[in-house]
Regions:
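Amphipathic, coiled-coil-like alpha-helical segments
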Residues: 2-5, 30-74
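Conserved alpha-helix in the HATPase_c
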Residues: 22
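Helix-loop segments that flank and shape redox-cofactor active sites
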Residues: 3-19
Length: 74
């Protein structure tokens, strides 16, 4: 998860929607498999915002996802 977190932050910094969408998609699948439905939900929200190119929603959904990852990794 720490590596995925860094990829998300780098993608945001670079404005790389493809990376954000791809990493969110990977996390969406992994969350359910490892028993973290909250991770799946937040990753899906980010993936959907990226797919729809809803630029105003992306920072907030990314922040929610990164905060959740931080909670898991504590």
């Amino acid at each position: 998860l720490p590596e995925r977190r860094m990829q998300l932050l780098s993608g945001m910094e670079e404005g790389d929607l493809f990376t954000l969408k791809s990493v969110a998609h990977q996390l969406k699948g992994a969350g359910g498999g490892y028993g973290y439905p909250g991770l799946t939900e937040r990753a899906q929200q980010l993936e959907m915002a990226c797919r729809a190119e809803k630029h105003a929603e992306i920072p907030g959904t990314l922040k929610n996802l990164v905060s959740y990852i931080d909670q898991i990794c504590r």
